From Swiss-Prot:
It comes from Streptococcus agalactiae serotype Ia (strain ATCC 27591 / A909 / CDC SS700). It is found in: Cytoplasm. Modulates RecA activity. PANTHER family: REGULATORY PROTEIN RECX FAMILY PROTEIN. InterPro entries: RecX_HTH_1st, RecX_HTH_2nd, RecX_HTH_3rd, Regulatory_RecX, WH-like_DNA-bd_sf. HAMAP family: RecX. The keyword Cytoplasm applies. Belongs to the RecX family. One of its GO terms (cellular component) is cytoplasm. Its main location: cytoplasm. It comes from the Bacteria. This is Regulatory protein RecX.
Length: 258
């Protein structure tokens, strides 16, 4: 078979043979096999050209995908599959890119954690789940997470949350809210408990009284038309306790309110 034409088409080249067969190949393929118009190729060489072209094209696709931002091995495999790269050569493409350090799940984890420490608000448990979803092995994630002390980040977040809720919630509800928020973000109970204790939050009696009477007004309006005196009182007490107010404070406020 003779090569009758090699023509550039955007990022690829078309290679035409005198047996009417056309191939899409990369520039690397042309260089590797030193292809030129008029060259004679046998069936074995043609098959090698096809395999190399597919491998080269897949690698170029991978490099293009990686050029926008860091990717995990799983993300890259999915991208290559979506672009119809032969599943048999994808492992070879991945190995090639890994050997040149274009993809490195350990480095990805390190960058992900560092970015979270700099600008994020997630603790290790949430970070681990996010990285697992990206196809990274658990042992790689855990190894990197164990090297990080998340207490400083938890402390910074607890201070922000405290400023947000300090004049809106009674002491118990405030501490519960901080604990719930920190654990939901992926920090373990011990770290959350420690940073909340370090805030040294004290009860503001004047604020608590103001908040409890505002809540009494709200709950009274809600229940007063539905329940009599005893049932009304119990409904209000239960509602306020669920919101973090202390039983004795509620009883004291009710004596003046009702």
């Amino acid at each position: 078979m003779k090569i009758t034409k090699i023509e550039k088409k955007k990022r690829l080249y078309t290679l035409e043979l005198d047996n009417t067969e056309n191939l899409y190949i990369t520039e690397d393929t042309i260089v590797h096999f030193m292809l030129s118009k008029g060259m004679i190729v046998n069936a074995e060489k043609l098959e090698n050209i096809k395999k190399f072209a597919q491998l080269s094209y897949g690698k170029n696709l991978g490099l293009y995908y990686i050029s926008f931002k860091q990717r995990t091995e799983k993300e890259l495999i999915k991208y290559l599959q979506q672009h119809d790269i032969d599943s048999k050569i994808i492992p070879q493409i991945i190995d090639n890119l890994k050997s040149e350090n274009w993809i490195n799940d350990k480095n990805y984890v390190q960058s992900f954690i560092q970015q979270n420490l700099n600008t994020g608000d997630k603790g290790p448990y949430v970070i681990k789940q996010k990285l697992l979803q990206k196809g990274i092995k658990s042992k790689i994630i855990e190894s990197e997470l164990q090297a990080i002390n998340f207490q400083d980040l938890a402390s910074k977040i607890s201070q922000k949350l405290y400023k947000k809720y300090q004049n809106k919630l009674p002491l118990k509800a405030l501490k519960d809210k901080l604990m719930q928020s920190l654990t939901t973000k992926g920090f373990d109970y011990q770290i959350a408990h420690t940073v909340i204790q370090n805030l040294e939050i004290e009860k503001d009696q004047e604020l608590e009284e103001d908040l409890i009477y505002k809540e009494l007004d709200k709950q009274y309006q809600k229940f007063s038309k539905k329940y009599d005196q005893y049932e009304l009182k119990q409904r209000i007490i239960n509602a306020l306790m669920r919101k973090g107010y202390q039983y004795e404070d509620i009883k004291s406020a009710l004596r003046e309110y009702l």
